[in-house]
A protein has these predicted regions:
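The feature marks the mature, well-folded catalytic cores of soluble enzymes
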Residues: 2-328
């Protein structure tokens, strides 16, 4: 894999999350306090045999992935866990909402274990149930709730998913967001009948899907800010909108800017830009291809030898793809 030194957006833990500039990249892991840690972990895994099933999310480091029985995105891994009813212990190497999803789909005799209970997703944390319920009540007060279907991204907490279920909504993934939106609009008679979607927690996935795949105008997408009264929107703006996007974002994909895309095209001959739909809209517009994590992986796998790619997604996945495809 070839790396190019380009001026990325500055990162840091102290940066306001609303800036979408991302979070600090922690760098290399420190040496294990126990030099025999890996050997002991592998021995324990072997001893437990089929009683143990380890799931590794694509975004994990190789030091973690080495223990995984299967790798994938959050939805794929949750389904894999459900398909292994004989596994007494399901260890999910991911973040909190992922383990929650697996726990929902697995049987009562299975234990889903999150190795680090503090492992969270900043985007999932941007849509809390009390905030969403307040927004729902505000939509009723504005006279538009009856036309709205709530749609949440897989990257959300279990209580947010349950809220959508209670209110006639649905959960989507980055792979099927367009299908989910089509279904949601149909529940209220379609776009021409004034149907609307309240989409959370990632505004960018919602906007990119609505505009680029559904043909909804950019000006028909408004952003609901849960930190402002009434979401910062007037009743007139809500009535005119087709997509009400929650003001949330991915702190990793928020790193990428259209300026970086321009710099890549100017400095790397024949580069193809491949990004995740959680990237900002102006980045997606300048990319050659956009798609889910699984789409990104399959695209690189199928790409011809010698092709040059710049991938706008999580670092560990990109580095792993580079190692697996050194000819590209």
């Amino acid at each position: 894999m070839t790396t190019v030194d380009l001026p990325l957006l500055p990162l840091g833990r102290g940066i306001d999350r609303a800036s979408e500039r991302g979070v600090e990249c922690p760098g290399d892991l420190p040496p294990a306090s126990d030099p025999d840690l890996v050997a002991r972990a592998l021995a324990a895994k072997e001893a437990l045999g089929e009683r143990l099933f380890v799931l590794g999310h694509h975004y994990q480091r190789d030091e973690v992935i080495q223990f995984a029985d299967v790798t994938g995105d959050s939805f794929k891994l949750a389904r894999e866990a459900a398909a292994r009813p004989d596994a007494e212990y399901v260890v999910f190497c991911g973040v909190h909402f992922m383990a929650e999803s697996a726990d929902i789909l697995t049987g009562p005799g299975q234990q889903v274990i999150l190795p680090d209970l503090a492992a969270g997703c900043s985007m999932a944390d941007m849509a809390r149930l009390p905030q969403v319920e307040t927004a729902w009540e505000a939509l009723a007060a504005a006279g538009v709730q009856d036309s709205v279907v709530p749609v949440t991204y897989m990257n959300s907490s279990a209580d947010i998913k349950a809220f959508c279920g209670r209110n006639g909504g649905v959960v989507c993934t980055s792979s099927n967001a367009d299908v989910a939106l089509e279904w949601a609009f149909d529940q209220k008679g379609g776009l021409d009948a004034g149907a609307k979607v309240l989409f959370f927690p990632d505004q960018h996935l919602g906007r990119n899907t609505a505009v680029l795949q559904m043909g909804i105008a950019l000006e028909e997408c408004v952003v609901w800010n849960p930190l402002l009264p009434g979401g910062g929107l007037s009743a007139e703006e809500l009535r005119a909108a087709k997509m009400i996007l929650w003001k949330g974002h991915c702190s990793v994909h928020g790193r990428f800017s259209s300026a970086v895309v321009d710099e890549l095209r100017a400095t790397v001959p024949d580069v193809q830009i491949l990004v995740h739909p959680e990237c900002q809209h102006d980045v997606v517009l300048k990319a050659d291809l956009v798609g889910s994590t699984e789409f990104i992986i399959k695209t690189i796998e199928a790409a011809p030898s010698g092709s040059v790619w710049a991938i706008g997604t999580e670092l560990n996945l990109v580095q792993r793809l580079g190692k697996e495809h050194p000819d590209k």
